[in-house]
Design a protein with these regions (language model features):
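Bacterial signal peptide processing site
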Residues: 20-22
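A surface/extracellular/periplasmic glyco- and lipid-processing/surface-interacting theme
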Residues: 29, 49-105, 112-367
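C-terminal motif of bacterial Sec signal peptides marking the signal peptidase cleavage site
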Residues: 15-18
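Post-signal peptide N-terminal segment of mature Sec-exported envelope proteins
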Residues: 27-49
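Repetitive helical segments and hydrophobic/amphipathic motifs
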Residues: 11-13
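Sec-dependent signal peptide recognition
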Residues: 2-9
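Flexible, active-site-proximal loop/turn residues at the rims of small-molecule/cofactor binding pockets
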Residues: 25, 110
C-alpha cells in the first residue's frame, strides 16, 4: 500500500508564463484540498464500468444527447445549443435556470477583484427556457469555447477585445436585447433569456425569446458546417476509479477563485458534485434545485493579460495537465485544443487514451 496526497490540482506549483506577458503569471494553488488516501499498486489500464447501457432500449422518440448522453427528445437531435454568459457576482444571485444547463464553464473573468469568475452555461434544449441569467458581457475566451459546441453565444456586449472574435466565420452570437425583469437590482443585474413574447409588467414592453431571435438573424437553429461532432466520449456504463492505483480522493474541490470561493463537494447520496460559492450551496431560484455535476474537468491553462484586468486564456495548447473527477476520485489527464474552434480533447495521462466520461452534466474550469 502507498499514500498519495493531492496537494494541488496543477503539477506546476511555481509560475506559469502566459503568451504575450512580460512577467510570469502566478499559478493557482491548492485547487483540491490535500487528502491522503490508501491505494494499492495494481496497474489498471481502464476505468471500471458497471451496468452497460449499450443494450438499453431507447424510450420512444428519443436519442442520447451529445452533451450529456441522457435520453432527450429526438426532435432536438440536430438543434445547436446556446452558450450563455451568466453573471457570478454575489449581487446577481440567485441565478435562474442554471440547474437546467448541460455543461457549465467557470473561468476567471478578471485578474482584478480576487479572480472573480463568470459562468458560461451550455444548453441544448433552449426552447424550454423560462428565465436564464442574469446575463453579462463576454470575453475572447468564451468565443473559442462556445465554438467547440457550435453554440450561439448569448451575452450583453463586452470590451473592444471581442470585436475580432465576433467577426470570425465560425462565430455566432446574440448580444444584448434580452428581457428585463423587475428584481429590485441595478440595471446590469436585470437581463435574462426568456420565452417568446415575455412582457415586463412594469414597463409593458414585450421581448423576443430565442426562437424569434434566431428567426430574425442569419443563424440556423441547427448545426452548421462548423460543427465537428460530439464533444465528449461517454462510457456505456458507470465510470469509477476504485481499482486505479493512481486515482486520488477528491471529495472537496476548492477552486482558486478567492472572490467567489467556488467549491465542489462530493455528495455520496447522489454520486454528484454539488457546487458552492460565497459559502453557500448554489440553488436555482426557480426550481430550488442544487447545481450539481456527474463530471468535473479541470484544465491547467495559462493566460495573457490584455490590460485593465481583462485577459484571454491560452486555450489553444497541447499536452497540458488537468484532472478528470467523478464518483469521488480524480485521475490526471492531459488536454489538447488545436485551433480556435476545435474541440478540446482530454486524454488519460496514464494510458494516453481519450477519456470516457459518465452520463450526466459536466463542470469545466480553466485554472
Amino acid at each position: 500500500m502507498k499514500k498519495k496526497v493531492l496537494a494541488a490540482i496543477l503539477l506546476a506549483v511555481g509560475v506559469l508564463t502566459g503568451c504575450g506577458n512580460s512577467e510570469p503569471i502566478s499559478s493557482p494553488i491548492q485547487t483540491v484540498e490535500a487528502e491522503p488516501i490508501a491505494t494499492d499498486t495494481k496497474e489498471v489500464e481502464q476505468p471500471a464500468a458497471t451496468e452497460s447501457s449499450a443494450d438499453e432500449v431507447a424510450p420512444e422518440h428519443s436519442y442520447r444527447s451529445e452533451l450529456t448522453n441522457e435520453w432527450i427528445d429526438e426532435d432536438l437531435k440536430d438543434q445547436r445549443p446556446i452558450a450563455v454568459m451568466v453573471d457570478n457576482e454575489r449581487t446577481a444571485l440567485p441565478h435562474f435556470g442554471t440547474a437546467d444547463a448541460d455543461v457549465v464553464y467557470e473561468i476567471m473573468n478578471s485578474t482584478l477583484n480576487d479572480r472573480i469568475t463568470r459562468f458560461m452555461v451550455v444548453v441544448k434544449d433552449w426552447e424550454k427556457i423560462e428565465q436564464l441569467g442574469s446575463i453579462r458581457s463576454a470575453r475572447p475566451t468564451n468565443f473559442m469555447l462556445a465554438a467547440e459546441w457550435n453554440a450561439v453565444l448569448c451575452h450583453d456586449g463586452g470590451p473592444y477585445f471581442i470585436n475580432d472574435w465576433v467577426a470570425k466565420d465560425y462565430s455566432a452570437n446574440f448580444s444584448g436585447g434580452f428581457a428585463r425583469f423587475n428584481n429590485g437590482k441595478a440595471t446590469e443585474f436585470t437581463e435574462y433569456i426568456t420565452y417568446d413574447t415575455y412582457t415586463n409588467s412594469q414597463k409593458g414592453k414585450t421581448y423576443d425569446g430565442l426562437k424569434q431571435r434566431f428567426a430574425n438573424s442569419k443563424y440556423t437553429t441547427t448545426y452548421n458546417d462548423y460543427y465537428q461532432g460530439p464533444h465528449f466520449k461517454f462510457a456505456d456504463g458507470e465510470v469509477t476509479f476504485d481499482d486505479r492505483s493512481d486515482a486520488i480522493s477528491a471529495t472537496t474541490i476548492a477552486l482558486p477563485f478567492k472572490h467567489n470561493g467556488s467549491t465542489l463537494k462530493y455528495n455520496e447520496e447522489t454520486g454528484t458534485y454539488d457546487y458552492y460559492e460565497y459559502g453557500s450551496a448554489h440553488k436555482d431560484a426557480d426550481s430550488n434545485a442544487q447545481l450539481t455535476f456527474e463530471n468535473v474537468i479541470l484544465q491547467d491553462t495559462t493566460f495573457a493579460e490584455l490590460g485593465e484586468g481583462y485577459l484571454i486564456y491560452n486555450a489553444i495548447d497541447s499536452g497540458r495537465s488537468g484532472y478528470y473527477i467523478t464518483q469521488g476520485k480524480a485521475i490526471e489527464v492531459t488536454w489538447t485544443k488545436s485551433s480556435e474552434n476545435a474541440i478540446t480533447h482530454y486524454y488519460d495521462a496514464k494510458t494516453g487514451e481519450e477519456i470516457q466520461i459518465n452520463t450526466g452534466k459536466t463542470y469545466i474550469s480553466l485554472i
